[in-house]
């Protein structure tokens, strides 16, 4: 753009001063309007110089020419001709700009901080009016030279090259046009209405060659539906299903036309009728009320509703409710030594019974574990192994109702009895009870002669059985029976005080844990034993010397119980030695019992300044780790009379072994192992061989470690 402007200026100046190289061509040729519309050419503004009577060297000519400074320097001063047209819009625009400049200068000088936006809005309005006005061109008059030759007129069809011409220029882009249509007569893809099939002429022209692409056809109808959403309306057909539905959610009213196989699971009330009972298969699981007519059919394994049918022959292993099954043949159970069994006498009670059974069948076996109060009947019953409730037996068994026939029906007692036996006298006389191996309650059977023998069977109708009964192996209760028995065995282990003072023959007990008063001294005595010898003790054999074992209370009867080889001397001195042993017991027992045990740990004359549980560790140079010495109570002890003597003492938990016993040295530093580890305290000590050993005392909390170091520092201050 700048080059074109420069060339135009040079041509114009050379033309005015006759410096053109080609004199034949008087002026430049203006391009056509079509060419000028396609390109933008900036032209300088021109002034109209009109001096019909003046010379070309006048000052007006110089002022009128915008390029008067380009005159030749030789001073010829020939007049220049300005042939550029001056339009009315240019004059208006110039006047507008001069007024706008003056207004802006006045406003800025008066008010430097003024807002110029209103001026620009008005300027924009005025300039739009000027640019929209029609352009009128005015031709400048031509000036003649010295000769009479008239130069050719230059057609000025150019528009103003001002910025106003920018709106009139239309820039059009390239256009793409297709001269001929494609040779394809029938296209593959059609976007308009369907074309009619034209008959093709038989020719060899290449333009008529039809190019066909792939075709996709979806014609045809689906013969069979994969998914049928509409239900079938054919209600006349009757289809018989051979397989039963696994689940039934509604009440089924089966008929002869339907299948005979029933649903395995029935979730509602089954009201099926008109079905053959022999081919009827009951449901495995029944969740509703079932009205079964045939009692011989199989019952459901699990019944969650109330069954209105008759009870089955098999009873459940677990019973959670009271059973109210009646006997069928009641009349056969009386006036017989061995009653006949009823129709359901073979029924077995559940293994676990959690309620009071009211079944009166003759041969009902009791549950192994009984958690309730059993109502025993007349029939023969077996007691449970473990009895946790008070036994309230009824009257005699059915076999003992007849006075003439005395038949014994043994019933086993529970092996473990955790409550007191409150049985009636009739039951004890009528039954042979095996006493429990372990007795945890107080036996109150004082009326019978052999009631203190837990395992001795009782006699029926006053008959005394001579068989020997054994005591329980372990007796944890107090036996209050004071009657005399012929054959009595003392329990192996006795944990309570025994009051069997009138027994004729006493057996030495190996272990005695309570206060007992037998004549013999036990091997292991854990309590005070006092021998009560009867008046006719001369007839009883002399007590033997007990074996030496673990004696926590010395049996003092051994001083007067030594025997001699002479039998006559033993009989004469038995009573004297017995009296002397009792006196020696009273005299020697007083100082032995009153003497306290003096336990000293060496801390009696010291004051504990600090005491806290801690873990003691030492550093192992080989493994580069800390080895634990033990866990115990870390104490800081100070002498009461000498504050300068302070030591560290740590005993292990349990055995009380000394883990650390070292004197606190004033020059040693007892500080944390690291600045952040206040619970790990270094405790330097001097070993027996003179070496320095540093222990690490590990506390659970950091506050405990701070208290430990503070207690040591306070003790050091008192040492000085």
Curated annotation (Swiss-Prot):
**Annotated GO biological process:** mRNA export from nucleus in response to heat stress; NLS-bearing protein import into nucleus; nucleocytoplasmic transport; poly(A)+ mRNA export from nucleus; post-transcriptional tethering of RNA polymerase II gene DNA at nuclear periphery; protein export from nucleus; protein localization to nuclear inner membrane; silent mating-type cassette heterochromatin formation
Give start-end positions of Low complexity composition bias.
345-360, 479-495, 534-548
Which topology term describes how it sits in the membrane? Peripheral membrane protein
Which ranges carry the RanBD1 domain? 583-720
Give all Phosphothreonine modified positions.
361, 590
In Gene Ontology terms, what is one molecular function of this protein? Answer: structural constituent of nuclear pore
From the Swiss-Prot or TrEMBL record, give the protein name. Answer: Nucleoporin NUP2
Q: Which InterPro entries match?
A: NPC_Nucleoporin, NUP2/50/61, PH-like_dom_sf, Ran_bind_dom
Tagged with keyword Transport? yes
Q: How does it assemble?
A: Component of the nuclear pore complex (NPC). NPC constitutes the exclusive means of nucleocytoplasmic transport. NPCs allow the passive diffusion of ions and small molecules and the active, nuclear transport receptor-mediated bidirectional transport of macromolecules such as proteins, RNAs, ribonucleoparticles (RNPs), and ribosomal subunits across the nuclear envelope. Due to its 8-fold rotational symmetry, all subunits are present with 8 copies or multiples thereof. Binds to the nuclear basket of the NPC through NUP60 in a (GSP1, GSP2) GTPase-GTP-dependent manner.
Recorded domain comment = Contains FG repeats. FG repeats are interaction sites for karyopherins (importins, exportins) and form probably an affinity gradient, guiding the transport proteins unidirectionally with their cargo through the NPC. FG repeat regions are highly flexible and lack ordered secondary structure. The overall conservation of FG repeats regarding exact sequence, spacing, and repeat unit length is limited.
């Amino acid at each position: 753009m700048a080059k074109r402007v420069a060339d135009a200026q040079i041509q114009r100046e050379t033309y005015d001063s006759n410096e053109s190289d080609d004199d034949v061509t008087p002026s430049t040729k203006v391009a056509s309007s079509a060419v000028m519309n396609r390109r933008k050419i900036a032209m300088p503004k021109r002034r109209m110089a009109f001096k019909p009577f003046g010379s070309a060297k006048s000052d007006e000519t110089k002022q009128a020419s915008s390029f008067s400074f380009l005159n030749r320097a030789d001073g010829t001063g020939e007049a220049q001709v300005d042939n550029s047209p001056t339009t009315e819009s240019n004059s208006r625009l110039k006047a507008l700009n001069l007024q706008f400049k003056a207004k802006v200068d006045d406003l800025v000088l008066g008010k430097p901080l003024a807002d110029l936006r209103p001026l620009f809005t008005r300027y924009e309005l005025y300039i739009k009016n000027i640019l929209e006005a029609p352009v009128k061109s005015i031709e400048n008059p031509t000036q003649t030279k010295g000769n009479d030759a008239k130069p050719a007129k230059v057609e000025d069809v150019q528009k103003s090259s001002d910025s106003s011409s920018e709106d009139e220029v239309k820039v059009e882009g390239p256009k793409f046009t297709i001269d001929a249509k494609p040779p394809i007569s029938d296209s593959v893809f059609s976007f308009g209405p369907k074309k009619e099939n034209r008959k093709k002429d038989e020719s060899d022209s290449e333009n008529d060659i039809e190019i066909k692409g792939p075709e996709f056809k979806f014609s045809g109808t689906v013969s069979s539906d994969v998914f049928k959403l509409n239900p079938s309306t054919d209600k006349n057909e009757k289809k018989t299903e051979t397989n039963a539905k696994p689940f039934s959610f509604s009440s089924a009213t089966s008929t002869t036309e339907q299948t005979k196989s029933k649903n395995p699971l029935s979730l509602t009330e089954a009201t099926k009728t008109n079905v053959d009972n022999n081919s009827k298969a009951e449901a495995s699981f029944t969740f509703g009320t079932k009205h079964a007519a045939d009692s011989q059919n199989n019952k459901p394994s699990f019944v969650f509703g109330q069954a209105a049918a008759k009870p089955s022959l098999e009873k459940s292993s677990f019973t959670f409710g009271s059973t109210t099954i009646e006997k069928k043949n009641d009349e056969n159970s009386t006036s017989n030594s061995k009653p006949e069994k009823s129709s359901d006498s073979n029924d077995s009670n559940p293994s676990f019974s959690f309620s009071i059974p009211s079944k009166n069948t003759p041969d009902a076996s009791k549950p192994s574990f009984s958690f309730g109060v059993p109502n025993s009947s007349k029939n023969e019953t077996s007691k449970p192994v473990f009895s946790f409730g008070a036994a309230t037996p009824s009257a005699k068994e059915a076999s003992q109702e007849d006075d003439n026939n005395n038949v014994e029906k043994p019933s086993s007692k529970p092996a473990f009895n955790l409550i007191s036996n409150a049985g009636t006298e009739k039951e004890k006389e009528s039954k042979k009870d095996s006493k429990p191996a372990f007795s945890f309650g107080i036996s109150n059977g004082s009326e019978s002669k052999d009631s203190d023998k837990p395992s001795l069977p009782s006699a029926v109708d006053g008959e005394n059985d001579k068989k020997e009964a054994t005591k329980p192996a372990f007796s944890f209760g107090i036996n209050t029976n004071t009657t005399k028995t012929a054959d009595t065995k003392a329990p192996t282990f006795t944990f309570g005080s025994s009051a069997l003072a009138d027994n004729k023959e006493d057996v030495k007990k190996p272990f005695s844990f309570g206060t007992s008063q037998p004549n013999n001294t036990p091997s292991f005595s854990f309590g005070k034993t006092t021998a009560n010898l009867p008046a006719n003790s001369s007839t009883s054999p002399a007590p033997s010397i007990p074996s030496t074992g673990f004696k926590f209370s010395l049996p003092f009867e051994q001083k007067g119980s030594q025997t001699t080889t002479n039998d006559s001397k033993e009989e004469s001195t038995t009573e004297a030695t017995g009296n002397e042993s009792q006196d020696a017991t009273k005299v020697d027992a007083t100082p032995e019992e009153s003497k306290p045990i003096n336990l000293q740990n060496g801390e009696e004359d010291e004051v504990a300044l600090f005491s806290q549980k801690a873990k003691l560790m030492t550093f192992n140079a080989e493994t580069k780790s800390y080895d634990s010495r033990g866990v115990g109570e870390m104490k800081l002890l100070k002498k009461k009379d000498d504050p300068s003597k302070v030591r560290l003492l740590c005993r292990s938990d349990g055995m009380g072994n000394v883990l650390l016993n070292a004197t606190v040295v004033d020059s040693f530093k007892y500080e944390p192992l690291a600045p952040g580890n206040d619970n790990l305290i270094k405790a330097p000590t001097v070993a027996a061989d003179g070496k320095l050993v540093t222990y690490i005392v590990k506390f659970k909390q950091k506050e405990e470690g701070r208290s430990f170091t503070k207690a040591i520092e306070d003790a050091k201050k008192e040492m000085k």
